[in-house]
Design a protein with these regions (language model features):
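Outer membrane beta-barrel
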Residues: 1-7, 25-165, 188-193, 197-205
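Transmembrane beta-strand segments of Gram-negative outer membrane beta-barrel proteins
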Residues: 1-19
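Short acidic, glycine/proline-rich loop/turn micro-motifs
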Residues: 12, 62-63, 169
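Surface-exposed beta-loop-beta
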Residues: 15-17, 163-212
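Short N-terminal helix-initiation segments at or just after the protein's N-terminus
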Residues: 21-23
Length: 212
């Protein structure tokens, strides 16, 4: 949980002169910016399942919102600014160290941040702006994955629904392409994602990812 002090007022006209009130100490906010729930289970005989549910700002719900374009009129909205995302929900069959078959909603390991998106794997509080600006982050889609370990190498090959090119932009490249305005992901085209990592040198990871 987090507590912050920031500018907020019920008087819409104060926003047109924010500099006048920049030192106003009377406003604060409690929030839970980010919470993640993991649930995994081992069925035995090589079968496992995994899931990851992410909550941002305590999730969605009904909230009141001030419309500044309508002279500060209050409106009741169905959604709050938070999010609830099912980032992973898959079942996996292990055939050996060298081959695992994973099916369901999976993370696409394109780029370093997506491949290692858990906060324990990077040093900053926020994800790197470079990747997060131009790539879906965290990039998760429903598909099939083959992955395994061969010596000091790790590979992963995925079959996925293709990105939505209508959501590409000049400023954010393919960032919005993994989303969908529907209740499902449109899969008129299919895509392949591949990632290869090498761990030959202790403490050093060298990787390459591709998407087609």
């Amino acid at each position: 949980a987090a507590y912050t002090r920031e500018f907020f007022s019920d008087n819409v006209y104060r926003y047109s002169n924010a500099g006048k009130y920049k030192n106003d100490p009377s406003h604060g906010r409690f929030d839970i910016p980010h919470a993640v729930v993991y649930l995994n289970y081992d069925f035995g005989k090589g079968w496992t399942m995994g899931s990851e549910i992410e909550f941002e700002h305590t999730g969605t719900g009904v909230s009141f919102e001030k419309e500044y374009e309508e002279s500060g009129e209050w409106e009741q909205e169905v959604e709050k600014g938070g999010e609830v995302e099912l980032e992973q929900f898959w079942i996996q069959k292990r055939f050996g160290r060298w081959l695992n078959l994973r099916m369901g909603h999976i993370v696409v390991p394109f780029g370093l941040t997506n491949a290692y998106h858990e906060p324990l794997h990077y040093f900053t509080v926020y994800r790197p702006e470079g990747e997060a600006t131009i790539l879906p982050c965290t990039w998760h889609q429903t598909g099939v994955s083959l992955w395994g370990l061969l010596g000091s190498w790790r590979y992963e090959l995925q079959l996925l629904p293709g990105l939505d090119a209508m959501s590409f932009s000049r400023d954010k490249w393919i960032q919005k392409g993994a989303g969908s305005a529907m209740e499902f992901a449109v899969a008129n085209k299919y895509a392949i994602a591949l990632r290869v990592d090498n761990y030959s040198i202790p403490g050093l990871r060298i990787g390459l990812s591709a998407y087609y």
